[in-house]
Amino acid sequence: SIITTIKRLAQSGVSNYSNTVKHWIDNSDYNISEEKKKALETMFAKSHVSVIYGAAGTGKTTFINYISNFFKEYSKLYLAYTNPAVNNLKRKVAATSDCEFMTISKFNNRYNNDIKRKYDIIFIDECSTVSNKEMKEFLELADYKLLVLVGDTYQIESIEFGNWFDTIRGFLPESAICELVKPYRS
């Protein structure tokens, strides 16, 4: 189940993650807010899954870009429920080497047809729109080291039954949950 997989991923973090990311932030040209710095420094310290919650305009996609650039040498997959959301990620994420972008249904269909690839890090945007069924299928098919789940719990919900994104926060260490609250656009 979704919760079982999330709990397994949350059992341990990436060794020396916090120190490495602090060094990257100190030497980066990005003007990263304190809110995002704190989240970046802890998100994978105790877990291999991290969740980013935030309303529209709080900088979730910008934050995805920071994470992507920190992990720029790694293979990355960006998923979203809709094609417009996938295209938005393509436009706004600058870490373009070894990246793939697609809808979660396209990913699930490809992998059901045995086109398998291992990724270092997978990002799923607009998680509140992904149904329990699609997420369960994704978790059964995907091969990855790190998982970043991004969304707005106030956004339109999944058309099919999908409460997993709101529920998983209770199964993660506090350091793996990032709640973006400061609005950057209105």
Predicted regions and their residues:
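Conserved ATP-binding/catalytic motifs of P-loop helicase motor domains
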Residues: 1-186
